Amino acid sequence: RKVALLSFSNPPYNFATVALLRGLAEALEQLDADSSVQAVCLQAEGKVFCAGADLVSENGFGASSEDPLREFYDQVQRLFQTRKPIVAAVQGAAIGAGLGLALAADFRVASPQARFAANFVKLGFHPGFGLTHTLPRVIGPQHAAEMFLTGDRYRAGDVLPWGLIDRLCE
């Protein structure tokens, strides 16, 4: 039995795209089917975990579908269907969709440099990635409301007592 390491990369900020989410979902489905894998460690390459959804580049949000929002959420839903335990290793910014990706994991381990934000209010749109369900469930409605309504960034050490991360490590 083993822990599988699943790394993703979309430099420089590891923005979430439909293609990136599809790749993660496909990899997680394969790992679910592998009886030798007990758990998955999800990590990003580079200094940033995921700085949000790619809303502007030609490879971003709407690049792969006539209904990009539907395609994006279809891939997000696939991530949440994983049966094996997932530990997210968050080494940098986890903003917007990046926060959602971290919350798709069962556990979150973060470096002191990690930053978390649900900055949707600053962008003028509704929180995505299932965050209106997952964030209050993990950190409680009061802290979730604070994150949603301010859009502020929080250091890993600040959100450890809230339960947003499970461990703080170098």
Annotate each predicted stretch with a short phrase.
Residues 9, 44-45, 51, 91, ...:
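A secondary-structure boundary/capping signal
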